[in-house]
């Protein structure tokens, strides 16, 4: 067994040509500890990891490597009033292969460690599924990119690592909301490594047995049990789905869904109101409303026959990074495709659209 720093280095292996460094400031903004972040275009070393563990210099790694593969990923929940104990319990209850760590400002990083490298796109897809099942479908996923334009200087985005210094704020959680020691974390993370085959076999709701080819959010909410407080809006959207699937029998299907999956069932008069509402006009899914929003998996939903594929045309933008050259060069993910942009193309809609047409 190697040293702490070597094991930590191996666990968070990522891009070999760059890493991140963080300087913590003595200020907070909207509940988040402020810091200066910078990408260093040099390899991370075991010596730098030791400095991180000793609290001398905070480092982060870029999960995606130069070949668009990764050996770990993370769900980044930036909610600083987060109930970490409840989150830990939900991860455990759903039997997800995630290590729950507190972030520096009180949010959470949920790490997934692989026994083999997998495509960054596969990592992002699976973590998005897990995040949606946990009710955090709109949070950030690392790696932020599926593909890097490595030959153009694109290195991706880094995530801060846990166990900085005496780790008063960044540590892995225990069942009773305590903290794991560094050695215990390393043991747990190494034991939690999973193969691609075993990862692909995990399905947390939304596996198609309920509401086939429907939005994964509705599938997950249904399979977990539709609770009070979310019944009306969930059933409205279930009704929208059934109207598309079976225009003749959707009313009966909606009533059956209510009886089988709502806890407790919605009163009959409320179901009638929903049916009358859907009779008056054709609605589309209310994706921005709860509880759908928290269980959103937009990328997967777009592939479903009765998902949002025909109702939403706005592109999904993520993973913006910059090479601070003269002039600056920007990189952005558009529906999973990596674009290289000038500042003008990034600022002006017509120029941005032209770049999309030329590069995608």
What residue ranges belong to the model's regions?
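DNA replication initiation modules
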Residues: 61-82, 88, 115-233
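Modules that initiate DNA replication and primer synthesis
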Residues: 107, 114-120, 167, 190-358
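DNA replication initiation on ssDNA origins
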Residues: 1-72, 82-87, 163-166
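Conserved short hydrophobic interaction patches
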Residues: 90, 94, 126-134, 257-260, ...
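Short, conserved phosphate-binding/catalytic loop or strand-edge motifs used
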Residues: 100-109
């Amino acid at each position: 067994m190697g040293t702490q720093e070597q094991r930590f280095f191996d666990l968070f292996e990522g891009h070999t040509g760059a890493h991140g460094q963080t300087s913590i400031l003595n200020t907070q903004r909207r509940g988040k500890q402020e810091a200066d972040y910078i990408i260093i275009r040099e390899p991370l070393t075991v010596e730098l990891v030791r400095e991180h563990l000793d609290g001398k210099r905070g480092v982060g790694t870029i999960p995606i490597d130069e070949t668009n593969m990764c050996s770990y990923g993370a769900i980044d929940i930036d909610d600083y009033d987060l109930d970490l104990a409840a989150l830990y319990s939900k991860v455990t209850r759903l039997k997800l292969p995630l290590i729950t760590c507190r972030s520096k400002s009180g949010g959470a990083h949920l790490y997934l460690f692989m026994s083999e490298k997998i495509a960054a796109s596969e990592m992002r897809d699976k973590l998005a599924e897990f995040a949606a099942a946990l009710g955090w479908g709109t949070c950030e996923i690392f790696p932020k990119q599926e593909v890097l334009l490595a030959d153009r200087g694109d290195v991706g985005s880094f995530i801060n690592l846990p166990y900085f210094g005496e780790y008063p704020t960044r540590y892995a959680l225990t069942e009773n909301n305590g903290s794991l020691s560094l050695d215990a974390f390393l043991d747990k993370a190494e034991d939690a490594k999973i193969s691609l085959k075993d990862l692909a076999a995990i399905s947390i709701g939304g596996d198609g047995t309920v509401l086939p080819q429907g939005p994964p959010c509705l599938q997950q909410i249904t399979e977990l049990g539709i609770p009070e407080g979310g019944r009306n809006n969930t059933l409205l959207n279930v009704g929208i789905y059934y109207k598309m699937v079976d225009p003749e029998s959707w009313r009966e299907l909606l009533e059956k869904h209510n009886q089988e999956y709502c806890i407790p069932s919605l009163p009959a008069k409320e179901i009638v109101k929903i049916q009358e509402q859907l009779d008056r006009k054709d609605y589309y899914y209310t994706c921005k409303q709860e509880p759908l929003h928290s269980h959103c998996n937009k990328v997967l939903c777009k592939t479903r026959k009765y998902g949002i594929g025909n109702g939403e045309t706005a592109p999904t933008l993520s993973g913006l990074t910059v090479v601070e050259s003269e002039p600056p060069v920007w990189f952005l993910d558009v529906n999973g495709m990596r674009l290289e942009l000038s500042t003008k193309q990034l600022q002006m809609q017509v120029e941005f659209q032209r770049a999309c047409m030329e590069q995608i």
